[in-house]
């Protein structure tokens, strides 16, 4: 009993440390930039009734909403990845690797290129695309059950197929691709309060439903036979939680574009620290995902100033080697 209490206390301590780290990273991100600001200016901006000086305008209209978007995107992608890893019984599952992000991406590109006046419906259309891609992967991988190797193969195939659709649109509509190209790279430039307002409901609903399903995901991760023996409706749980993962991924992709490896790397890092209990893994993944995206975006924005490196490139640079490490370790 003492050991269980110590383990629980340790996990709660990790969550608290992550909360503090996210807040600290956002404060540092507000300070750093081409125009540095002080802590006193940040405090004044947060409580001022009017934004009268340049520093306040930079903090409130540019850096703060961008930080919030980065945190929400990171949380959504990380939790989506954690869910997919349980649902698909594969530690290498990730919204991008298994084609979910590609489905959302294709749907988004269709709107950006063919219906540019309807960009306000991108989140909804991206969700439909993400859900369709997830179901396609699941259907292709099903043969008397789902095996991890088939999930990866089906995901790669679906991602390649949907990626070819994106490429075809970019080729046939070359005169309209500027906005779509910037979106596909995965970046947070020019993100402000309107994007926060669009993303927040998706993130809130998705994260709440994810946490409500945490116990079921923990049971599901034990294996189908064990889960059925414990009374879990396995396929129903898979379908519902796949919907939740698609909602989170679609919300993130619709705002930030195609950012890979967050859903792969973050849950694994947390799993090494706090174990496989999804009651702690999901909130921990959300916080660590937020932390990593805020830090990565800050590095991309500040390190090579005045050139801004999209956060999608930063994540791919560090995430790809980690993915290869996981492949070698699992083999």
Question: Predicted regions: what is each one?
Answer:
Residues 1-331:
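Alpha-helical transmembrane segments in inner-membrane proteins
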């Amino acid at each position: 009993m003492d050991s269980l209490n110590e383990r629980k206390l340790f996990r709660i301590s990790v969550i608290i440390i992550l909360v503090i780290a996210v807040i600290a990273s956002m404060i540092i991100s507000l300070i750093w930039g081409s125009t540095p600001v002080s802590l006193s200016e940040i405090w004044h901006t947060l409580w001022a009734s009017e934004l009268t000086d340049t520093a306040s305008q930079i903090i409130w209209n540019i850096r703060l909403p961008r930080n919030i978007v980065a945190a929400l995107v990171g949380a959504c992608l990380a939790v989506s990845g954690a869910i997919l890893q349980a649902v698909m019984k594969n530690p290498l599952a990730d919204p991008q690797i298994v084609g979910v992000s590609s489905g959302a991406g294709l749907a988004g590109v269709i709107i950006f290129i063919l219906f540019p006046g309807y960009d306000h419906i991108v989140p909804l259309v991206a969700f439909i695309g993400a859900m369709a891609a997830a179901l396609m992967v699941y259907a292709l991988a099903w043969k008397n059950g789902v095996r991890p190797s088939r999930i990866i193969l089906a995901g790669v195939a679906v991602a390649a197929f949907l990626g070819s659709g994106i490429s075809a649109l970019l080729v046939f509509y070359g005169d309209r691709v500027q906005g779509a190209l910037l979106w596909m790279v995965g970046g947070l430039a020019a993100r402000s309060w309107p994007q926060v307002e669009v993303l927040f409901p998706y993130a809130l609903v998705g994260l709440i439903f994810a946490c409500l399903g945490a116990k079921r995901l923990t049971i599901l991760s034990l294996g189908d036979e064990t889960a059925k023996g414990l009374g879990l409706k396995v396929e129903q749980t898979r379908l519902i939680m796949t919907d939740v993962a698609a909602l989170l991924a679609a919300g993130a992709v619709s705002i930030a574009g195609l950012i890979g490896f967050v859903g792969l790397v973050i849950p694994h890092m947390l799993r090494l620290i706090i174990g496989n209990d999804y009651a702690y893994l999901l909130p921990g993944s959300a916080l660590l995902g937020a932390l990593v995206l805020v830090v990565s975006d800050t590095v991309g924005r500040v390190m090579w100033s005045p050139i801004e490196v999209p956060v999608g490139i930063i994540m791919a640079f560090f995430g790809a080697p980690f993915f290869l490490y996981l492949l070698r370790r699992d083999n």
